[in-house]
């Protein structure tokens, strides 16, 4: 099993690589790529950790050596948010990066499962899809926007508010991966009750959690460590699924188009990627209104990505 981390010298990439070096199954290969010359050094540093995961680092303009033979590709390359920026401000730089990486993946490892972390995810995933379609290698079962951070934040914040064990809390999160498009289904959290005020405040906090970290870091970065943890959780889920385990995770995928062509929802993962898109259950009136209210934004985000590749 080979996992490639693209953008491995960045804050998310280094955190993700550290976690994967410790947690991938024994015998796995971990490839790190970044345009930054430090990347082989990141791999050298991590290679001193005593686990049965081989690691190599590659720098420069061409990600091909890292991508060759990859089963899973996790893309965190791009610029990070700074105070005053929203995820859309990242588009101008990150769209081109994701497009060029998808073009290489289409040639080098077209059968890999691809997890896109690079923001704005609502838009970068459709960009990758359009590139892969043009190359004739698109498989919607194998392209994912990683929204796991919204899930782990929701689990953490609910556990804090209600005095629960965060490892036991399960919160479905649907929609997209920015602002109002992030919709935690708090009505479905088992074993806890929320007041209307708590639901409104908690939903807003989950939607704005990225901004909370950007502002707290005061210009020194964005949510890199928690995102590394979230990406590791999703990456390991893909690895387990490819090895034959049945795994359920939330991800931003091309679905049946009921609300938008791409939508974050629960998926059953298997050896070919998405085996089944699962229903997300009944919504409360608050959640129905929030879903209706986000769709224009989400569909617009998707269209921007499609148009970028035309």
Curated annotation (Swiss-Prot):
Binding sites annotated in the UniProt record for NAD(+): 7-13, 34, 94, 117-119, 227
Catalytic reaction equation(s): (S)-malate + NAD(+) = oxaloacetate + NADH + H(+)
A Pfam family the protein falls into: Ldh_1_N
Keywords on record: NAD, Oxidoreductase, Tricarboxylic acid cycle
GO BP: malate metabolic process; tricarboxylic acid cycle
Binding residues for substrate: 81, 87, 119, 153
Active site per the UniProt annotation: 177 (proton acceptor)
Enzyme Commission number, as recorded: 1.1.1.37
Assembly information from the UniProt record: Homodimer.
Family membership: Belongs to the LDH/MDH superfamily. MDH type 1 family.
Function per UniProt: Catalyzes the reversible oxidation of malate to oxaloacetate.
Name by which UniProt lists this protein: Malate dehydrogenase
Species whose genome carries this gene: Vibrio vulnificus (strain CMCP6)
Gene name as annotated: mdh
